[in-house]
Amino acid sequence: MSSGDGAPETAADDNDRRLRVLELYSGIGGMHFACPPDKTRVVAAVDVNTTANATYAFNFPETRLLQRNVQSLTARELDALRPDVLTMSPPCQPFTRQGLQLDSQDPRSASFLSLLRVLPTLKHPPTYILLENVKGFETSSTCDAFLDVLRDGGYHAHRYLLTPTQFGVPNSRLRFYCLAKLNPLRFSDCPTACDAQCNQEPPPNVTKCDRPRKLYDFLEQTEENSCSDYLLPDRVLSRFAYILDIADATSTNTCCFTKGYGHYVEGTGSVLLQASRDLMHEVYRHVQPRTAVQDNVLESLRTLRLRYFTPVEVARLMCFPDDFRFPPELKARHRYQLLGNSVNVCVVGSLIRHLLDDVGN
């Protein structure tokens, strides 16, 4: 891991004709996994989170990784990297429904606003830009400032509100995406400049799926006892049984997994039923809203063997490849936190390929 300039590029790097990607707010590398290797190579990644960077370096040991706040990046440093593609997923907390929605007044917006001041001064601006954030970002003053920078810089931008279920993945994770190309490049499906609204359907040339796959395909096929560490404890069953979002192996959807999954209960993600649905319906006849369950009902709830999805399963639902790994010393709670802050690799990968549809043609 590097906190400075990293290793110098070699002659072989100079001969590599693939597009150069700069990954800002790189997290655990979701954007990197999403970039098509035949068209792109990530020349640098930047993030301030040490735990995320340890995971990134564990999966991409050869990539130049800068342990820095994006706010510290200068125009000179960005120009030296010569990125053709800029990907970024800025902090979402200023725009979430659960937060205070302080928008640009939130200190966590400072690094992105600083970047917006630097971008217009670049001598070598990126040709392609992809940004991901939560629903709510699209109505913020921060987004308005971002779109102003794109327009003034000669970019053509398309905006989307998309969820993985539209791509066949059984997980709801509605996110805002902005794709931008520098003039004179245009989007093949719509050659106009910045759209006036967010599209809620994927681009026409992106493969959609009307029926998501079943959860079974994403579960760890292990002995049931091996997941005993993930069973919901009695304190959760007794207090929160009524508000749980419960899925089973045949389900075609799960709720969005957040960084609080496994620690908090309400609104952080679905849990998995390891018994029959008939048994679940019978047991839940005795579960009352907003009331702690009686001992006999708690005993019945235990028979459902409700458990959290494992970090491996959450990673699969986020479409990380099977060879994605966390450092072995990282605890489950931290793995959930990192996944909750990451991007869906399938959705981003489809959009990047759409963004780069004019490359290599």
Located regions from the model:
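Core alpha/beta nucleotide-donor-binding catalytic domains of modification enzymes
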Residues: 2-126, 135-141
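A structural signal for well-ordered alpha-helical segments within the folded catalytic domains
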Residues: 29, 50, 113, 141-144, ...
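Amphipathic alpha-helical segments that form well-ordered structural scaffolds
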Residues: 34, 55, 114, 145, ...
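Class I S-adenosyl-L-methionine
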Residues: 73-83, 95-264, 270-280
